[in-house]
């Protein structure tokens, strides 16, 4: 595809708006999604809207950076420093980014049934995704796995957080929950469990079994990704919870 061609001159199947309507947004490249927001490119003989979208990503991806990670936190001034991006285009892009954050971080309503790790991760997204400090939180559920509430238990540093089983189960009991999911974030974005994460999970499983409050999962979240330790370890086989 030639990025200097006007979008209107492209075959309809290659035009971002038409492609989105026909195939769905997930099938568009990042440059094509940006092109829809931009509306126009740099003008006749210069970059088209798609070309400008690609150029923005190239500029943000310098020095081996993830361009979308940079775009997530970019300022208006940084965007407008890119040739072809004025106040109108910059504010449109920033508004779309903020709307995306709010949609992603929206919590399930009370009484939502938490029956899947992805639903649990979404319920904790606003507290744990894209955070600069490690946080440890709990999802409090009733016997039918309906959401009672969420609670951040501890806040640590950029590299570690300290959560004691005593503090975790105190909150669970105080809220009257009969099932619990625990979660913490890794600010680095790497959701691989550390030896300390696994050791804490073992302690929590033992405590949950003793208290007859099943621990349904331990999630690790970071930069929009998550890992379910129940699905990826054998810890629940070693200490069944009767849930």
From Swiss-Prot:
MPN domain sequence ranges: 112-235
UniProt cross-references to InterPro entries, sorted A to Z: MPN, RadC_JAB, UPF0758, UPF0758_CS, UPF0758_N
Residues holding Zn(2+): 184, 186, 197
One Pfam family named in its UniProt record: UPF0758_N
GO BP term, example: proteolysis
Family in the record: Belongs to the UPF0758 family.
Renumbered ranges of motif JAMM motif: 184-197
GO terms assigned for molecular function: metal ion binding; metallopeptidase activity
Protein name: UPF0758 protein Cyan7425_1778
SUPFAM superfamilies: JAB1/MPN domain (SSF102712)
Keywords, comma-separated and alphabetical: Hydrolase, Metal-binding, Metalloprotease, Protease, Zinc
């Amino acid at each position: 595809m030639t990025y200097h061609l006007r979008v209107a001159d492209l075959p309809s199947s290659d035009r971002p708006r038409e492609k989105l309507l026909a195939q769905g947004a997930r099938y568009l490249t990042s440059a094509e999604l940006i092109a829809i927001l931009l509306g126009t490119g740099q003008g006749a003989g210069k970059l088209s809207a798609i070309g400008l979208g690609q150029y923005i990503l190239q500029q943000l991806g310098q020095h081996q950076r993830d361009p979308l990670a940079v775009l997530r936190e970019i300022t208006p001034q940084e965007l407008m420093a890119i040739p072809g991006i004025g106040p109108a285009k910059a504010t449109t892009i920033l508004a779309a980014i903020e709307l995306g954050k709010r949609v992603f971080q929206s919590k399930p309503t009370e009484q939502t049934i938490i029956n899947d790790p992805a639903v649990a991760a979404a319920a904790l997204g606003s507290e744990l995704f894209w955070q600069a400090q490690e946080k440890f939180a709990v999802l409090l559920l009733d016997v039918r796995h309906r959401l009672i509430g969420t609670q951040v238990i501890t806040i640590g540093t950029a590299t570690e957080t300290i959560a004691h089983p005593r503090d975790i189960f105190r909150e669970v009991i105080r809220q009257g929950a009969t099932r619990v999911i625990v979660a913490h974030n890794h600010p680095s974005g790497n959701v691989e469990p550390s030896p300390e994460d696994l050791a804490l999970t073992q302690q929590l499983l033992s405590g949950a079994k003793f208290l007859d409050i099943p621990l349904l999962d331990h999630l690790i979240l970071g930069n929009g990704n998550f890992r379910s330790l129940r699905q990826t370890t054998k810890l629940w086989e070693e200490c069944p919870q009767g849930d």
